[in-house]
């Protein structure tokens, strides 16, 4: 099975700049794998200090760009993992999340984590089919 790294402007370069040893998007075997995405502003490469709803929207907007760059779409996402720093954000994250996935959402895991080296509250990864 061939593995192809997909470069996504505004996302991949942020991870490289931070020295994080991962690929933002990998296409292999008919699937697209999107690494956990923090709420990065694709134009500035910075993680802004905004509320959890705005962070979730930024993460899912970036995810949309990533799956499209790999030849898929959000309606072809089959699995997501949502990482959150405070379980109290569950409803706020879900309010935004459901707007991206509609009536047929993918399988999902919701994980409460401690924190990250940078100041943000939500990160989401996904697997999509091509």
Residue ranges and their predicted role:
Residues 1-61, 65-78, 84-130:
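N-terminal presequence-like segments and the immediate start of the first folded domain
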């Amino acid at each position: 099975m061939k593995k192809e790294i997909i470069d996504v402007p505004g996302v991949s370069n942020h991870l490289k700049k931070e020295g994080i040893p991962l690929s933002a998007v990998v296409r292999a075997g008919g699937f697209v794998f999107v690494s956990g995405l923090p709420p990065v502003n694709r134009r500035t490469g910075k993680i802004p200090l905004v509320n959890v709803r705005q962070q979730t929207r930024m993460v899912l907007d970036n995810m949309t760009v990533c799956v499209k760059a790999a030849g898929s779409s959000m309606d072809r996402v089959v699995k997501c993992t949502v990482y959150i720093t405070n379980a109290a954000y569950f409803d706020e994250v879900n309010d935004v999340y459901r707007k991206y996935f509609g009536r047929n959402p993918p399988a999902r895991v919701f994980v409460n984590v401690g924190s990250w080296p940078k100041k943000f509250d939500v990160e989401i990864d996904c697997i999509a089919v091509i």
